[in-house]
């Protein structure tokens, strides 16, 4: 099993505001699709509800304490330990509580750094490059649909 974080955050580590992304960046959505298609996304219930439906062509797993939660096309787990039973490449997809719980346990992180400061009420936990090696850093292309500077980072935990 490979365990990765997949997240976009701004320069203040904001990941959300009122259960929505504070920015619109189609490049990042394509990046998420490219990385996670054919694999497993694990997210909390609030993150799933902000998306509104299972993402196609990948396994969608929702971690929730709500034993009555049931959505077609979604597998439900009720504990962090259940994540370790999932096969293949598993991406931790948010939100804040799940990221806080898993950041010290993942092998690597795929981070889209949004080069701006946005209003937010949900944050990615602090991390330092002392703990992570930069495997790749690619500037996102700007165009009429992608107007916010952004960088795609792949960080691997230092041994």
Swiss-Prot record:
One of its GO terms (biological process) is one-carbon metabolic process. PROSITE patterns: DHFR_1, DHFR_2. Signal peptide: none annotated. Keywords: NADP, One-carbon metabolism, Oxidoreductase. Its EC number is 1.5.1.3. GO terms for cellular component: cytosol. Key enzyme in folate metabolism. Catalyzes an essential reaction for de novo glycine and purine synthesis, and for DNA precursor synthesis. This is Dihydrofolate reductase. It comes from Staphylococcus aureus (strain MSSA476). The gene is folA.
